[in-house]
């Protein structure tokens, strides 16, 4: 009978020899695994950071919980009645104007213009400066990139020449949907923008939309509760 100590294991020599012979193949596999792990880890970290920044933006920019539009401006008494439903109502008017962003004489897009926002749906300035004069405007960054419009350029909106002083992102327009029923957002032919109160008023009320935003006094715990609260408020 042969003892365990005297028994020779052929793998002791075979495995090192095979590893050395196929070293290049194993090195490629090892590097591929390291690269894959690094890529996935980086993606998860970046994704977590983006979600955290997105969630924090709701408080930082006081993003609305919902919006509605009326045919006429609401009077103070109507707003007071609505606010008895434990919400805060904000006027968030805008005008929607035809625009020739390359000034070639043809209308190529529509810009939804808001006056300065300080209380709700605040704006993030990503490049340039805030508008200070009536003929100055800050437009959405994606729209500007897609249409090759830069800070300092001039666009024509409803016959008015407006200087682009900055590129912005509106907190309630994380994607440029002109209508909630749209299936695809359009950052080429549609943009949102900010002007001074004085500049906004130069467009008059021909294309004025009486839009209102609301925020809850007590925030819903989750999306299900938020949906129910919105449905109850809009009844």
Task: Specify the residue positions occupied by each region the protein language model found.
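Membrane transport/envelope proteins' first extracytoplasmic loop
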Residues: 2-235
């Amino acid at each position: 009978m042969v003892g365990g100590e005297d028994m020779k294991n052929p793998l002791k020599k075979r495995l090192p020899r095979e590893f050395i012979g196929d070293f290049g193949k194993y090195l490629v596999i090892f590097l591929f695994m390291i690269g894959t792990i690094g890529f996935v880890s980086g993606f998860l970290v970046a994704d977590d950071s983006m979600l955290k920044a997105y969630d924090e933006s709701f408080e930082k920019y006081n993003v609305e919980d919902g919006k509605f539009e009326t045919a006429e401006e609401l009077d103070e008494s109507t707003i007071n009645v609505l606010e008895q439903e434990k919400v805060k109502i904000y006027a968030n008017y805008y005008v929607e104007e035809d625009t020739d962003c390359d000034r070639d004489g043809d209308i190529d897009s529509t810009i939804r213009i808001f006056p300065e926002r300080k209380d709700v749906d605040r704006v993030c300035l990503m490049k340039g400066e805030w508008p200070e004069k009536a003929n100055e405007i800050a437009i959405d960054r994606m729209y500007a990139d897609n249409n090759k419009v830069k800070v300092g350029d001039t666009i024509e909106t409803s016959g008015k020449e407006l200087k682009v002083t900055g590129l912005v992102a509106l907190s309630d327009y994380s994607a440029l949907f002109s209508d909630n029923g749209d299936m695809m957002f359009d950052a080429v032919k549609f943009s949102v923008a900010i002007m001074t109160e004085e500049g906004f008023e130069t467009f008059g009320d021909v294309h004025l939309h009486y839009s209102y935003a609301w925020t809850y006094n007590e925030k819903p715990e989750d999306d299900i509760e938020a949906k129910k609260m919105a449905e109850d408020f809009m009844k």
